[in-house]
Structure formats: structure tokens, C-alpha cells
Regions:
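N-terminal low-complexity, Pro/Thr/Ser-rich intrinsically disordered segments
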Residues: 1-14, 165
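Acidic/histidine-rich, surface-exposed loop or edge segments in extracytoplasmic proteins
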Residues: 1-7, 62-73
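Solvent-exposed, acidic/flexible segments
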Residues: 8-16, 77-85
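A short, polar/proline- and glycine-enriched secondary-structure boundary/capping micro-motif
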Residues: 74-79, 155-161
Length: 165
């Protein structure tokens, strides 16, 4: 199941207020930004008031992605930051969408992804146009980051073209 428990009833694509209602928690906008400003920004992050290490990404005011870098929450399957990579592999390797690969920029990191994506184009024009992924990034055989959301945003985890809050 794709998602992390922190998202509760929040669904990707919801606006900021709907996410807050679904979570039953207050979102903290970037310093100096109001909810109204974030709704109009091409890209921005918000954090969850009482959950350190949880960041939500909004694109044009819509929830697209969640990132967790502390063991404050778990996935719906029970995984959390700090878990052994082997545990994730053993539980997910039979999923038909399972992939494990090296980080392009840091040879000490590994990525494990599951989920469905839609890719259009070929070669240099190929791009992700839909679907949802959950990704586990590990270093030294421990999960250090969990990301979930619309596939195009999860695939940005190596920070190509990432937004500036």
C-alpha cells in the first residue's frame, strides 16, 4: 500500500485546508509565507506541527508528496526511518513494481521503489506523467528517508529541478 500513516485521510491532490482537516493537524508554512501565498506558489513545502521530520510538498496549492526523515511515523506496511534495508527488501521484493538501484549522485545510498507509474515519450523526451510511488532511501543498510506521492515528484528525490520552499 502506498502512503505513510501521517497522511491519514489526506489524499494527494488535496488543497492545504483539506489536508489539514484530513490530518487533524496544523501545517506550518515556510518562514514568511502564509497559506494564501503557498496556494499560489508553483512549489512549496509545509511541515506538520507536531511531527518532526515530516515535510509535505505542494504544487500550485495541491498536496503532491510527503517526505519523512525521522522515525516519527510509519508507512501503512509498518516501515519507518531507521529500519534495516534488508527488512524492506524482504517484504517488498515480490511486488511486481519493486525496483532497487544506486543513487546517481551518492554511491553510499540505495533506492527501493514500489508503485505504478505512467511514462510517456522515449529516450531523451521520456517523462513520468502519472502514478504513485513510495521510495525508501538507505545508507549503510538503514532506511534514512521515506518518500511517497505522485511519481513525478518522488522521482525528483535526487533533487533535479527541486523547488525552493
Amino acid at each position: 500500500m502506498i502512503g505513510v500513516v501521517v497522511t491519514g485521510d489526506a489524499k494527494f491532490g488535496m488543497d492545504i485546508e483539506a489536508v489539514e482537516r484530513a490530518l487533524g493537524r496544523v501545517l506550518v508554512m515556510p518562514k514568511g509565507k502564509s497559506k494564501a501565498q503557498v496556494r499560489k506558489m508553483e512549489c512549496s513545502y509545509a511541515s506538520v506541527s507536531d511531527l518532526p521530520g515530516v515535510d509535505l510538498r505542494f504544487e500550485n496549492g495541491r498536496f503532491m508528496y510527503v517526505s519523512v526523515d525521522k522515525p516519527t511515523v510509519t508507512t501503512r506496511s509498518g516501515f519507518k526511518v531507521g529500519d534495516p534495508e534488508r527488512m524492506v527488501i524482504d517484504r517488498l521484493k515480490t511486488d511486481s513494481t519493486y525496483e532497487r538501484y544506486d543513487d546517481r549522485y551518492d554511491e553510499t545510498k540505495m533506492h527501493i521503489t514500489v508503485g505504478k507509474i505512467k511514462v510517456v515519450g522515449t529516450g531523451a523526451t521520456q517523462k513520468i506523467q502519472g502514478g504513485y510511488l513510495i521510495q525508501f532511501i538507505s545508507k549503510q543498510d538503514r532506511v534514512i528517508l521515506i518518500e511517497a506521492g505522485e511519481a513525478a515528484f518522488v522521482s525528483l528525490s535526487e533533487r533535479e529541478g527541486d523547488c525552493n520552499y
